[in-house]
Amino acid sequence: MAYLLIRHKVADFAKWKPMYEAHRSARDAASLKDRLILRGLDNPNEIVLLFEVGDVIKARTFAASPSLKAAMEKAGVVDKPDAYFLQ
């Protein structure tokens, strides 16, 4: 089983969350299943996401896609995400 762990900061969690949820179909197409959405205790705008990965190639392609980058910018992601593929 493979997983994808992502950490990034957002400008405003309340704005980011509905935009993240609206992008679910793209994550589904990339074989990413949401497992956890966590927020920092000291900084609630620091987000950690854990996904179960069904197809690593699809997930890597999606993670590097310009459309994801644009969606993240629109949702208010304010730093470069840290992304780790794990097993």
Where are the predicted features?
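Short S/T/G/P-rich N-terminal loop/turn motif that feeds into the first structured element of a domain
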Residues: 1-70, 74-87
